[in-house]
């Protein structure tokens, strides 16, 4: 049986089995009879767990199977809750001395014995139903009606009826034929979310260029392909016949290679899901040097890369823009692009916003509206807009869309399905941070390790189940979004599994769209917009809720004392009128693992958290929190501590040896810096420093002991020169180093050891040619900010210039260079991936420059160039920090404003250089 953690389908059976085993240990001192019952429970639940996993792999379950699955899953939750309460009662009793502690233990044992009896009866009932109805014998035998494949219609759609196809069609043809005279086999992979029109695009391109080839074929592969049939279909297309004796993969591959040996062919392989399928298919694609072409379509990024890894390209299909979406939508409903009644325009735009440019979604919803007896009914249109998830579940007109969404979901592993469903917790259109999601998944028990959770996030991106929202400075995905239709699908699935409950304005107890039957709420997402919605929960039981997520006015937040067994607590509050609300109750939430609070004052709460022994992640955002935080009030096993930068940290930080993330605290006590060296597991460190020489003496020794550090960011008061110059050896896994307030005389020698460094922000006194060469050796760099206060003179030529030679900085995408004059020179081949260039300079020093952005035309990927020109030299120097006014390395000190002529001269020189660029990057020149 595959190992599962907490799962949407199986509930908490996996951790439950471990806890039942733990109860048998001597320290709990249970009676022999109770231990016997626990062993029996464990055996029964283990058998049920195996069947639940089997059921989870079955696409269609009958009602009997679904009902049994739901009851066993809910039973597992109830059993784990019982054990957790018992263990906490024993811990509380241990904390009491003498007779009182003994009585508490006796009471706890009595309660667990009674509860075990009750649970055993329920388990035996479930086991009896399993045996009586022989549920495992029917697994896989039930099958719903075959879903219509929307790709079939895509193959026979007339080009004249398509919208927004011309530009992607031309681009795909360009990629296919860009090396028309090249004899090698050329593969272009089209990749994108389900329903984006990949099949339609591939078919249109196939039809447009097929006359240029000797033979063509168009075949579909699908999720669970019969590769003999796929190969037969290819052979049928290029040869016209398939003898019956060719019925094995190897025979078909050999015949295809023979047929294609001397032909220029065009083959479209549609809907590939695995690299294994591609690896077999490509064996039949003869590399005959006749200029053959292959188009593949897939939802999965890795598969697209594998298909086009040699002599090929990946084309990521884009959603329709607003205009084309509207044209397609209105044409399907009203048979005209201009016939939509004025009264429906706003709701039409609202529906299209949910579709987000996905053609299949637009056509599916349009068909639903077009087939309604009152096509112009505003009430019906608004109902579709507001309750699309319900329509998705039951309306035949949306069968295509439901099928496409379910294909991607059903392809996920059990763990990935759970992680995917969890995204429905967040409000619509949320930008979801990866690091936050990773911490939540671990806290919920879906994943054991954060590294595994990060790989799951990447896999969901790779499979196009979620959309990238933003990248960080290192070029890694920082956040994601969920397509509105996918969110509706997730909410529908989660309701089926009673995985989470979302409520917005209407009471939960009256909202059948978010709860299933009489099952208890396990994860609750409360999303409110105004203070009139403060009774939506009514009298619903909340003690068993494992995850509570709140977005809304503080007055609407329920009492936290009602959430006895909560593990994950997220409070995003606005319009708060009170100081503390019910925050002191948090200290009694003994299972709390993740706590994030935004918009509330937490001064008193932060003094009461040391009893939360399971707490791993604590994040406080905003809320006017300031003052001091003594680390002795924090749980010693905390992994992540993120607090506002105006909250001062003090105490023995070294006792928190499990800490992995420490973000943003205000540091004025040198003891904190000295204690950092004990945090051997620390990976991300971001400090707001305020100190003098004692800080400089304490910081480096501690950093030298942090071997696991991945990211270091310092902010605040500028420290002395070269306080980090002797950081030897630096942590070899470091990928971010942002130390603008720790200036260096020159580029330190140790920086060449940082092979994984992707983001670097530093301040220098001098940048000679050797310094540029040292920085260029960091081939992984994606983001670079360089602020030079002194001299950049080339000692060999005496020119004031920084030359970036060919092949330097191969992966750099963002560069900020601050020096008195924009004296960068780019040779051909330098910075081939640079997209954004920002220059900060001073108009008064313009006469010193020997070159102004010379060779900028060689930056082939440049998209945007920003130039900040300071009229006042002292204002320019102040941007460097408290040592900026100290003259070093031949610096010039200017006190007067630069003449208008100098400013205009520099603007003209910069504009002239940038205008040479053939790619016409966007240009912004700002004067300060």
Residue positions per predicted region:
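Regulatory and partner-binding modules of innate immune sensors/adaptors
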Residues: 45, 97-194, 200-204, 295, ...
